[in-house]
């Protein structure tokens, strides 16, 4: 049985892994925001599917970890990650590839549908492999990003 501190360490490590992989996608597709959005959706689904136990651990314990002794470590990691994401949005907007959109809105339309379908899969409510939803959700996420209003 894992202790609370071991669980917290595992959650922080898992989230930092997801963030690291996200930043790699931003860097690998620097001039192609459509590829970034679609690949981020795929990443989330594949990350969930590749280690179901880790995904469940994060889903069940994330808020508790954020409020506990490792909360500041997680918050610092999140600040750095969100800063990188915001810088990417700004660079894409400055290059005319996307509108200068709100980070919160972009994050919601890209990740929320992938997170929701992942929850259904983790609960055993979907029969198909989670990765099979990547293409339609990626297309929907990109269409949603294109429909977002410029922040003002």
Predicted regions and their residues:
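An amphipathic alpha-helix adjacent to DNA-recognition modules
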Residues: 1-23, 38, 42, 82
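Short, structured helix-loop boundary elements
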Residues: 4, 8, 12, 34-38, ...
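Amphipathic alpha-helical packing segments from all-alpha helical-bundle domains
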Residues: 13-23, 68-94, 104-108, 116
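Hydrophobic alpha-helical connector segments
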Residues: 24-53, 106-110, 150
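Short alpha-helical functional segments enriched in proximate histidine and acidic residues
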Residues: 47, 88, 144
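Hydrophobic/aromatic-rich alpha-helical bundle segments in the mid-to-C-terminal region
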Residues: 55-60, 71, 93-140, 148-152
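Short helix-capping/turn signature of helix-turn-helix
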Residues: 60-66
């Amino acid at each position: 049985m894992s202790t609370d501190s071991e669980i917290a360490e595992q959650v922080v490590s898992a989230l930092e892994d997801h963030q690291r992989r996200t930043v790699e996608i931003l860097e690998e597709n620097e001039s192609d925001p459509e590829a970034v959005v679609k690949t981020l959706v795929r990443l989330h689904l594949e990350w969930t599917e590749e280690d179901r136990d880790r995904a469940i651990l994060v889903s069940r314990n994330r808020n508790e970890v954020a409020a506990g002794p490792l909360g500041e470590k997680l918050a610092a990691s999140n600040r750095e990650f969100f800063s990188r994401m915001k810088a990417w949005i700004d660079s894409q907007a400055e290059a005319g590839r996307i509108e200068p959109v709100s980070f919160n809105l972009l994050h919601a339309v890209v990740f929320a549908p992938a997170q929701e379908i992942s929850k259904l899969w983790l609960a055993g409510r979907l029969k198909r492999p989670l990765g099979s939803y990547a293409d339609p959700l990626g297309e929907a996420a990109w269409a949603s990003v294109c429909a977002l209003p410029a922040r003002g």
